[in-house]
């Protein structure tokens, strides 16, 4: 992905750095409307996820995370923008007439062919079980449960690595640094997700972030005591606590937030590093 800088005519363009525009012309049979209700609220109307609301209307693109068109070659016809994710998507025309969207693998261009199955070549964009991949293969869109579809390493630029295979399990190093076990029968796609420079974008102005449905972020130290534990005081006062706290009074900055006694605790060999 190329980062595009505009000429410095206004502050918003001077500070902005956006990706080169990839047009979106989705197929009607692969999209449907979605009602994004709640805006960060639960069923009682209480804010449970902050800084969310507004944003432009979106049409959801049906993405093929299962890749269950087995042993049928497909051709990349378009590379399109998807408002629901940072990664690009590409439209695939299969030999049997089926048309589907998949995540765009890094380096794939229009006209390339892909295939999914058990005995397919180790080529960028191909999907196959982990048991058929050599060690050290870079992969994305990884299944956790057989047949459920890819759930891991789907963000822009995400890539995992197959580092070991033993018994019925394969050992993967995920983008977060976590090392965990997954069944060798689960499938994954070879290569890295495209749009690697998505984290280098700078929107340049507040309005661009509002289009994405992100509301302004307010520091707790400038709030009133009724709104945040850090609030109150005369002038620029410190937080008045031994350690930072969340708006609900729980310890912040360092406390582990993962739920205890999850079924996957025994599958994680090393915690994430970031």
Swiss-Prot record:
Location in the cell: Plastid, Chloroplast
Organism per entry: Citrus sinensis
Gene Ontology biological process: translation
One example GO MF annotation: rRNA binding
Domain of life the protein comes from: Eukaryota
Entry keyword Lipoprotein: no
CC annotations in GO: chloroplast; large ribosomal subunit
Protein name: Large ribosomal subunit protein uL2cz/uL2cy
Gene3D superfamilies: 2.30.30.30, Nucleic acid-binding proteins, Ribosomal protein L2, domain 3
Self-association and partners: Part of the 50S ribosomal subunit.
Family the entry assigns: Belongs to the universal ribosomal protein uL2 family.
Region span, Disordered: 1-25, 223-274
Main location: plastid
């Amino acid at each position: 992905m190329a980062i595009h800088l505009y000429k410095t005519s206004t502050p918003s363009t001077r500070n902005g750095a956006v990706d080169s525009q990839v047009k979106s012309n989705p197929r009607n049979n692969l999209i449907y409307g979605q009602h994004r209700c709640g805006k960060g609220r639960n069923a009682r109307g209480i804010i449970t996820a902050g800084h969310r609301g507004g944003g432009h209307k979106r049409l959801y693109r049906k993405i093929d995370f299962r890749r269950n068109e087995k042993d049928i070659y497909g051709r990349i016809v378009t590379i399109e923008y998807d408002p629901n994710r940072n990664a690009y998507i590409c439209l695939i025309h299969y030999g049997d007439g089926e048309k589907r969207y998949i995540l765009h693998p890094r380096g794939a261009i229009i006209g390339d062919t892909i295939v999914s199955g058990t005995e397919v070549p180790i080529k960028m964009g191909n999907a196959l079980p982990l048991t058929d991949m050599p060690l050290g293969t870079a992969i994305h869109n990884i299944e956790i449960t057989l047949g459920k579809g890819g759930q891991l390493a789907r963000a822009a630029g995400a890539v995992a690595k197959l580092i070991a295979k033993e018994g019925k399990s394969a050992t993967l190093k995920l983008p977060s640094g976590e090392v965990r076990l997954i069944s060798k029968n689960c499938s994954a796609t070879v290569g890295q997700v495209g749009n690697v420079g998505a984290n280098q974008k700078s929107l340049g102005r507040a309005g661009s972030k509002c289009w994405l449905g992100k509301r302004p972020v307010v520091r707790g130290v400038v709030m009133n005591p009724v709104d945040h534990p850090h609030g109150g005081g005369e002038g620029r006062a410190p937080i008045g606590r031994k350690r930072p706290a969340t708006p609900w009074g729980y310890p912040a900055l360092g406390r582990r937030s993962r739920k205890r006694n999850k079924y996957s605790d025994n599958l994680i060999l090393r915690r994430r590093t970031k």
